Amino acid sequence: MNQIDLNNKIAVVTGGGQGFGYSMVERFSQSGATVVIWDKDKDLIESLNLPKNVTAVQTDVTSYESVENSVKETLSKHNKIDILVNNAGIAGPSFKTWEYPIDQWQNVVDIDLTGVFYCCKAVVPHMVKSDYGRIVNVSSIAGKEGNPNAMPYSAAKAGVIALTKSLGKELSDKNIAVNCVTPAAAKTRIFDQISQEHIDYMLSKIPRGRFLKVDELASMVSWLVSEENSYTTGAVFDLSGGRATY
């Protein structure tokens, strides 16, 4: 493992209790950061055997009040937030667009897009005050390509890409970098929400012929949240195994 220097940094990872999120939590903590997991699943975060430099706060990213409370709790313990990774997300069920249940559409968009906005809205002012921050939003190859039978997820993840570009420009005169990654699928708990037909479809589109490994995403993101990434902002970093066409 290449070592990235995150010493003395305070990092928040939403949806950090499993999958992509926990892989980043582990990588950041091994690189010297103090990490705070924001996750809605109380039972999950209580079951984790966390390193000394990792704590968890129950957070519902669809509630701005919950996000604000988590910011206050994190700042009360650590005085700052240097790194924010907006990773919390769900895939939602598989339906044709015209058959998609309205409540399920809203649920996916609330978590996958509005949750990113809420966390940025609550955290960015503190980064501006300290003139330092690194934000990475976890989008998806679906946000570029638009997966069939996954319209809300694809639309929300496309929105995350646009949000990243807008926020990156707004903060470009400060020592704050805002970028996003567009991973292909990985074998995480999110697969429990997806039909086998859709899983097979996603794999068939990846030229490398395999799904992404969670530590491969963590490796890229660990550099994006480091001080070394002092120039690139508002950018989209591909992790699709060759699937992306732009």
Give each language-model segment a name.
Residues F95-T97, P101-V109, F191, M202:
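Substrate-binding pocket helix/loop in short-chain dehydrogenase/reductase
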Residues C120, A156, T164:
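Active-site helix of classical SDR
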Residues P125, K169-D173, S230:
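Alpha-helical segment proximal to the catalytic Tyr-Lys
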Residues S140:
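Residue(s) in the substrate-gating loop at a strand-loop-helix junction
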